[in-house]
Amino acid sequence: MSARLKVVYDGMHYMIVYKSAGVLSQPGLASDSRPVLMSELRGLLSETLDLYSVQRLDACVTGGTVVAKNKRAAMMFSRYLKQGGGSGYGLTRRYLARINAQPVCDEGTIESPGMVTYYRRVRDDCVVVELKTGKKHQIRKHLALNLNCPIVNDTYYGGSVVKGVNGQIALHSAFVRTRIGKNMQDHLVGIEPQEQTLWKSILTENGMLPDDIVRTLTRDKLF
């Protein structure tokens, strides 16, 4: 696979693709020459697949993103994201974020018009975040503007600068849980070696997510 993309799971209905920083989830302006996820993916896979983007990550965000492998799967994921409950194919999206301040509360729900985010602190400067809705910049806005805890290297929302790291913020799509019928499947997505600079204070010596953070990411409910 490309150094920018890596298929970490390939199933019947969907795949999980690791997206590196600098890759767009959807085409930008005509003048934007950065690679686009779906175009890159179609160019890399040998077989011709009917692929649909389900989960969109900002270009500066790393980690796992869900790609449906047929139109029906895309429709079923979309139905769940719009209606929730038992409709469609269930999808839980959890992220790891390093932040510039410690939240006042260890866990909670952040709400603003049309947006709901859950969070749980796992380190003084690190939280696990779960999306209920998925609006543009939702996590970045909620952490910075509602919790006063901007994400490290996210200068757009007031985060501190990490020298030598450009085009990447300390926000990583680390866990995806799907439910298709009675089948529930968990996908833990680590941080690739070339993108670990922002995470060195969190990761183990081997560059892995530590056990306590994995337990929080994979628990049934965040709180």
UniProtKB/Swiss-Prot annotation:
The keyword RNA-binding does not apply. Transmembrane segments: none annotated. It comes from the Eukaryota. Its EC number is 5.4.99.43. Pfam families: PseudoU_synth_2. Keywords: Isomerase, Mitochondrion, rRNA processing. GO terms for biological process: enzyme-directed rRNA pseudouridine synthesis. One of its GO terms (molecular function) is RNA binding. It catalyses: uridine(2819) in 21S rRNA = pseudouridine(2819) in 21S rRNA. One of its GO terms (cellular component) is mitochondrion. It is found in: Mitochondrion. The active site is at 58. Belongs to the pseudouridine synthase RluA family. Pseudouridylate synthase responsible for the pseudouridine-2819 formation in mitochondrial 21S rRNA. May modulate the efficiency or the fidelity of the mitochondrial translation machinery. This is 21S rRNA pseudouridine(2819) synthase. It comes from Candida glabrata (strain ATCC 2001 / BCRC 20586 / JCM 3761 / NBRC 0622 / NRRL Y-65 / CBS 138) (Yeast).
